[in-house]
């Protein structure tokens, strides 16, 4: 989502609260819970899941392996649910022509760097750069080159913008900031 006026451009960045992340976390949780229940059923010799009789899966080695996969899956699933609840990667980009300042804010993981806040002067922006890598997994990323600081990505690598969309976005931003566009 973007909000623009004559002097300010604010672009909201979606973090980890995407539908695909919710789906993967849910599927992984259910699958790993199933694996753990099958492993536990084979250990106890009781039927905790009604799909099969417990005698069909021997605890050593199948039950141990399934329990291990279930526990590992629950750890990965809990990691995904934590990133979703913390909304890691979300934030905003604010370009203020009137004040001459660019502010980039992102939420990170809890701890010392939970809030990532970068502030630059607009006069230090050298260019807006588009990096294109074609192939099976095409990647188009928009960067802002800052004098003495390097490049700062403005779009996610998994955003999958079409060439026309990334060019449009780069052209509008470069025009707003009055800086050149570079393509790599």
UniProtKB/Swiss-Prot annotation:
**Location of the protein in the cell:** Plastid, Chloroplast thylakoid membrane
Record carries keyword Zinc-finger: no
- InterPro entries named among the record's database cross-references: PSI_Ycf4_assembly (IPR003359)
Q: Name one GO cellular component term.
A: chloroplast thylakoid membrane
Q: Where are the transmembrane segments?
A: 19-39, 57-77
Tell me the GO BP annotations in alphabetical order.
photosynthesis
Q: Which UniProt keywords apply?
A: Chloroplast, Membrane, Photosynthesis, Plastid, Thylakoid, Transmembrane, Transmembrane helix
Pfam families recorded: Ycf4
Report the main location listed first in the record.
Answer: plastid
Membrane topology label: Multi-pass membrane protein
State the similarity comment: Belongs to the Ycf4 family.
Its function? Seems to be required for the assembly of the photosystem I complex.
Recorded protein name is Photosystem I assembly protein Ycf4
Q: What organism does this protein naturally occur in?
A: Nicotiana tomentosiformis
